[in-house]
Amino acid sequence: MMKMKQQGLVADLLPNIRVMKTFGHFVFNYYNDNSSKYLHKVYCCVNLFMLLLQFGLCAVNLIVESADVDDLTANTITLLFFTHSIVKICYFAIRSKYFYRTWAIWNNPNSHPLFAESNARYHAIALKKMRLLLFLVGGTTMLAAVAWTVLTFFEHPIRKIVDPVTNETEIIELPQLLIRSFYPFDAGKGITHVLVLVYQFYWVLFMLIDANSLDVLFCSWLLFACEQLQHLKQIMKPLMELSATLDTVVPNSSELFKAGSADHLRDGDNPPPPPPPQSDNMLDLDLRNIYSNRQDFTATFRPTAGMTFNGGVGPNGLTKKQEALVRSAIKYWVERHKHIVRLVTAVGDAYGFALLLHMLTTTITLTLLAYQATKVNGINVYAASTIGYILYTFGQVFLFCIFGNRLIEESTSVMEAAYSCHWYDGSEEAKTFVQIVCQQCQKAMSISGAKFFTVSLDLFASVLGAVVTYFMVLVQLK
């Protein structure tokens, strides 16, 4: 059994995890006792059976009503629309280890005393945005389920059957249900009708939430990565100022130091601290208790020429421990950027193939919806349902693309932030650091759909353009 760990992305995304557990996703970690885990396994299996049962009955109805082209198209759209949910439930169950790995990847992030406040601020911003995203998508999903239910009672469904011999059209009244489905009994009368309505409402609600909860999880990961990149950009300027204090020149080479500005080391009457123990790697020093007050952490160091280099003070006016703190700040930035890259890579591994399946299904659905849209001839239930399908389907794609596009923009803007700093006034270490940053950030971070496409607004624009073009062609041919 794996105990609940209130840390990292698990703690940040705990509301998302609870929603996924509540609505039947196979999330079998983060429990406090084995009994809850066992009961949840039974619940998930029963829930999946109920969802698959209704999905299968819809497929049978598709075959039964395949004689009429309009009915065939409408039933196919419904089946494809809910295919997302079945695919994502099964996808998570099969590839859950990749999702657990992504949740755990931020359990032990590196930290630095100089940038703790900035890190906490951007973490709080990310947390607020992730909660807001979950609330908005959850509210929209509930509204869609209610609208779907209400729309059902505005029109009594019928089915037209054309007699091939007499060419007469026979109209058959169908049960007033949320979705057209085959049942081996009469589902249009009495208590049976009520029970089927309740079952179908449960089915629609759970299917919508199961699909969207996994989509929100994906977008929350990207949102968190974007805010971490914002954090790195924000600390770039103070990091450059710190890096500029380092220099590797030998003593008495004061001509290499530029004239300082008003920023300087705070002079004190206390004698310099004793030299620290020598170490082969200054980056690995324990930096705790180096400074005793806040001013020591916020001081801006200036190279000081002509001073006596003793007592552990180097040619740049920094003690060995101060130099170690500055170098550890550079190390913090690099390691945090590597950590973000690992997070984005893990997200792509966990969700990339699901994105491919989603886009393939969506492409077929939108193509059929474009055909359905050409048959809209007024304000009625048919028009409302067609428009609802289109808006909801495009909304799902847009949700992926807007966060994928932001990840690309934020990752490329890191290089711009590094280049715009006054790196040319710094030491050789500062210049080397900026060069490495620019080289590593030339290629933008992105999420791909199993290497077939990149999730961005360009993808959304191409899908939208293709659907509009196809719709206009159908209108011209009509």
From Swiss-Prot:
Domain of life: Eukaryota
tRNA processing found in the keyword field: no
Gene Ontology cellular component list: plasma membrane
Record has Transmembrane helix as a keyword: yes
A molecular-function term among this protein's GO annotations: olfactory receptor activity
Chain residue ranges for the region called Disordered: 261-281
Quaternary structure note: Heterodimer with conventional odorant receptors (ORs).
PANTHER family membership: ODORANT RECEPTOR, ODORANT RECEPTOR CORECEPTOR
More details: In contrast to other ant species, C.biroi ants reproduce via parthenogenesis, enabling stable germline modifications from the clonal progeny of injected individuals without laboratory crosses.
UniProt-recorded name of the protein: Odorant receptor coreceptor
Source organism per UniProt: Ooceraea biroi
